[in-house]
């Protein structure tokens, strides 16, 4: 009977020893598991960093593209603004051209009156105030015209210029160089450097 008990006790001890051996942690397995976990974490970190870098690169490219588009838009706007300013300036520059052309014959009449004023004054000295009034009108008209860019073309004594003068005839004149304006019948004018009326002249042969 004691022999059976002894065997039973040994059997239980062996079983417990096996169970303990099975349950005891393996240091090698634990080390491998820790390495795998660390590798997985590092891999995730690397992947995350790569994604962040890619996102940052894309953002930089987008910013560069937007900046270039903005600069092009600003440049286009500035060009359009300058073009419109030039157009407005051009319109303003020649807006009065048609009106001035219509008033030039009136100015011619005033000048003819003043040229013949001496005859009027000889016959009627009291007409001096009338002549002075006409002179004042002429001066005021010229101030208005000149403020808008009107200038009288030089004629008598200058070389004939087909762009500025209209030759009514030619004649010989002693001491005058050929193709020189020797007489002016009607003055010519430029408006902001554009000829609005040629001078009507006689040219020397």
From Swiss-Prot:
Disordered: region residues: 1-60
GO molecular function (one): adenyl-nucleotide exchange factor activity
Quaternary structure and partners: Homodimer.
Basic and acidic residues bias locations: 1-18, 36-47
Span of the signal peptide: none
Name of the molecule in the record: Protein GrpE
Keywords: Chaperone, Cytoplasm, Stress response
Biological process (GO), any one: protein folding
Localization: Cytoplasm
Family: Belongs to the GrpE family.
Biased composition (Polar residues): 19-35
């Amino acid at each position: 009977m004691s022999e059976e008990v002894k065997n039973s006790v040994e059997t239980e001890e062996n079983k417990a020893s096996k169970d303990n051996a099975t349950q005891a942690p393996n240091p090698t397995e634990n080390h491998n598991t820790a390495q795998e976990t660390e590798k997985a974490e590092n891999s995730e970190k690397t992947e995350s960093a790569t994604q962040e870098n890619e996102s940052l690169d894309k953002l930089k490219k987008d910013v560069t593209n937007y900046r270039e588009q903005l600069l092009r838009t600003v440049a286009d706007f500035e060009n359009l603004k300058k073009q419109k300013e030039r157009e407005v300036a051009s319109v303003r520059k020649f807006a009065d051209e048609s009106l001035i052309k219509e008033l030039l014959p009136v100015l011619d009449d005033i000048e003819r009156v003043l040229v013949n004023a001496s005859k009027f004054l000889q016959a009627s000295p009291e007409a001096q105030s009338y002549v002075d009034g006409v002179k004042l009108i002429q001066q005021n008209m010229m101030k208005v015209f000149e403020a808008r860019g009107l200038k009288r073309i030089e004629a008598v004594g200058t070389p004939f210029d087909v762009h500025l003068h209209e030759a009514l005839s030619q004649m010989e004149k002693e001491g005058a160089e050929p193709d020189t304006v020797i007489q002016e019948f009607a003055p010519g004018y430029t408006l902001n450097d554009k000829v609005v009326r040629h001078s009507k002249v006689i040219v020397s042969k």
